[in-house]
Amino acid sequence: LREPPIFVCIHPNCVPRFPELPHAQMIQFSLFNIPVRVLPWFWLTLAFIGGVLRADTRSEIFELLLFMLAGFISILVHELGHALTAKHFGKRVEIVLQAFGGYAAYSGGGRLSRFQSFLIIAAGPAIQILLGVAALILVIQVEGLSPYGKYFFVKLCQVSIIWAVLNLIPVLPMDGGRILETLLGPQRLRLTLQISIAVAVIIVILSLVYNIDMLLPIFMGLMAYENYKSLKSISWM
């Protein structure tokens, strides 16, 4: 089972197929006995979102690197929330950070109850929001932070809280959509898909009307389309 990517909130099946890069360029490590893989496209898309095309001066490039570090920590902590909770329930887990986000994969163990599934899904955005709040408290309370230090923790706060909140939008396959699916139950999958499509379309319209960053309506449009295909497929069953 794959969790949806985080920082742009788009499922692996909904993103363009990026060419495979040599595994030598992949970062691999273990954290809390959980394998973690960071694919090269993760850094490239994170740099794009951070404004690499606008970074001209040495200071702007350094700020971009700090933003990428903040994004990496925030997304990794989010996925650890999913993974550690799943591991607590006896699952084998792995974390992958890829283009436009990441996911926690888990398998094995016994069948999860709806409440256990809810806890696994909710743990990601919950711990990410706590990380953002901790970064905000640090910025407010700690005196003597360097300008770059303050910039880093402000960005860590922003990306953690904003991305976690976006990921709680009730649109499949984001965490909010998964929570809705868990609460309504498998018998109401059609209703979950209908709600996901409606919310995604509303967000696309509002994003275009209020000229919000184009990434959000693009990805919401993709998710609306994927959910529509899923709805059509179960209609034939």
PLM-predicted stretches and their roles:
Residues 1-2, 8:
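Intrinsically disordered, low-complexity Ser/Thr- and Pro-rich stretches
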Residues 2-3, 19:
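Intrinsic-disorder/low-complexity peptide segments enriched for small residues
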Residues 8-237:
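Hydrophobic transmembrane alpha-helices and their immediate loop junctions
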